[in-house]
From Swiss-Prot:
This is Acetyl-CoA decarbonylase/synthase complex subunit gamma. Binds 1 [4Fe-4S] cluster. Part of a complex that catalyzes the reversible cleavage of acetyl-CoA, allowing autotrophic growth from CO(2). It comes from Methanocaldococcus jannaschii (strain ATCC 43067 / DSM 2661 / JAL-1 / JCM 10045 / NBRC 100440). Pfam families: CdhD, FeS. It comes from the Archaea. Residues 1-61 form the 4Fe-4S domain.
């Protein structure tokens, strides 16, 4: 098992001047942030001086993860892979969400290449406030023609700012392609038989690249990586073969590589893993697969199978994926799973507490109280917008906990509600003193009424039911409250 590094180990190598030039109040604080990957070593200007050169190298060795962080792309967009330190997310966190690339064949017409490249770059959907996108474009030399390949590369780089992977098993084709590539590309792929030729090509062209090493044998991948490192090629990616007909074999290879890197500290296997769900797509077009019986359309079957394989591989250490399908229904589950896997379990997923107007609320609009757990917030606001709900949404600071959890933990309470009402000035924006609570928070009604002096109404269990609840009840609730308070 790798040695556990502490902030004190890093602190001992820092200047200890507490100059604050790094942006943190002390060297110990900076050491802690370095350990947590929330700061970079270049933020300390003193470490960049000749006097601290050796210390800087030692710190880099200490904080470098067992799986090397590798990137390709350009100044505007980079695809970053690897950087993980643990086998399981609960042990720390996973870093650098798996870049997902989609292929473009050089057999397509120039217009088709241009359109597909734009489609890949512009693909986006939003979930819980985060925009989920594709990360790179794979240009395949399907034609075998060098000129077509070079032209496709030029079109993609001209039309988009996406990082690119150039894919050919022929080192001579790659050599010519590298002459026209402007950015730092990922090169797919060198095999055991062609590795020497690829090393020669990279040295001749003198181009900064990420080289993919492809083999179905872990020992061969290790030997290939050792040879590359000996030749000064350090940005490597390992590609154990992806077997759609027997995906368990690929999963075993992924686990063996990652376990060797993290638990056995094998530096020759400490590189990102690339998997190819695209193989599953083409396999399913020509062969029966586990989901063939569910759909008649072969294309639909192939894309469903590709997405299934992609998710399976991402659950077992795939640091980058290459796919073919572009349908939203295929990519949405893959990108959603990626977002979930790479959520940092050490940090609550929270939004800023405060007052959020939904629609165009006025003085007679309802006031609804929820929590600042991000999934709750975005689900609630999404449901409200779909159902044309107009209201004032009060978002309480519950430490990023959901309604039922914060009620049980005591964060959803009268004191916090009172503080929120005072800080947001909601009392000046409405003519009533009514707060609608989620049904799951019904037990806090008395406490909130006592602490705030507002009347609490228990609403629905689910935010999708709020629209109907307000349309059927709000006017009556408001009228009764005004009559009661005018009488009083």
């Amino acid at each position: 098992m790798p040695k556990k590094i502490s902030a004190m180990d890093i602190y001992k190598l820092l200047p200890k001047t507490n100059c604050k030039k790094c942006g943190y109040p002390s060297c110990m604080a900076f050491a802690t942030k370095l350990l947590e990957k929330e700061a970079t070593i270049d933020q300390c200007p003193i470490l960049n001086t000749p006097k601290f050169e050796k210390n800087k190298k030692k710190i880099i060795e200490l904080i470098s993860p067992p799986v090397k962080e590798v990137w390709f792309g350009n100044e505007e967009k980079k695809a970053v892979m690897g950087g993980d330190e643990v086998m399981y997310r609960y042990q720390l966190s996973f870093f650098n969400p798996t870049p997902i690339g989609v292929d473009i064949s050089d057999e397509l017409s120039e217009e088709e290449i241009k359109n597909r490249a734009k489609e890949i770059e512009n693909f986006v959907f939003e979930r819980t406030g985060e925009k989920l996108k594709l990360d790179f474009i794979v240009i395949r030399n399907a034609s075998g023609d060098v000129e077509k390949f070079k032209k496709a590369i030029e079109i993609v780089e001209k039309e988009t700012k996406m990082p690119i992977c150039i894919a050919s098993l022929n080192p001579e084709v790659i050599k010519e392609a590298l002459k026209v590539v402007k950015s730092k590309p990922m090169v797919y792929a060198a095999t055991k038989e062609t590795l020497n030729d690829f090393i020669k090509v990279i040295k001749e062209v003198k181009k900064d690249v990420v080289l993919v090493l492809s083999s179905n044998n872990v020992k061969d991948l290790k030997n290939m990586a050792a040879k590359c490192l000996a030749n000064g090629i350090e940005d490597l990616v390992l590609e154990p073969h992806t077997y759609p007909e027997n995906i368990a074999e690929t999963l075993d290879l992924n686990v063996m590589i990652r376990r060797s890197a993290i638990e056995k500290e094998d530096k020759y296997l400490g590189f990102p893993i690339l998997n190819l769900p695209i193989n599953a797509y083409y396999y399913a077009l020509k062969n029966e697969c586990p989901i063939s019986g569910f759909f008649e359309d072969k294309e639909v079957v192939a894309k469903m199978f590709e997405a299934t394989i992609a998710n399976t591989l991402m659950n077992r250490y795939a640091d980058a994926l290459i796919m073919h399908g572009m349908d939203i229904w295929e990519l949405m589950p893959v990108l959603t799973l990626r977002q979930c896997i790479y959520t940092d379990p050490r940090k609550p997923q929270a939004v800023e507490p405060g007052l959020y107007p939904i629609g165009n609320p006025d003085e007679n609009s309802p006031v609804i109280l929820t929590t600042n757990f991000s999934l709750t917030f975005y689900t609630v606001t999404g449901d409200f917008e779909k159902d044309n709900v107009t209201c004032w949404l009060l978002v309480m600071d519950t430490g990023g906990k959901a309604v039922d959890v914060s009620v049980a933990g005591g964060q959803y309470n009268g004191e916090n509600a009172k503080k929120l009402i005072e800080e947001t000035g909601i009392a000046d924006k409405v003519s009533h003193r009514i707060i609608i609570l989620p049904a799951l928070a019904a037990s806090t009604r008395g406490d909130i009424e006592d602490k705030t002096g507002w009347t609490c109404v228990v609403g629905t269990r689910d935010s999708s039911q709020v629209g109907d609840f307000l349309r059927n009840n709000w006017d009556k609730i408001l009228k009764e409250w005004k009559e009661k308070n005018q009488t009083a």
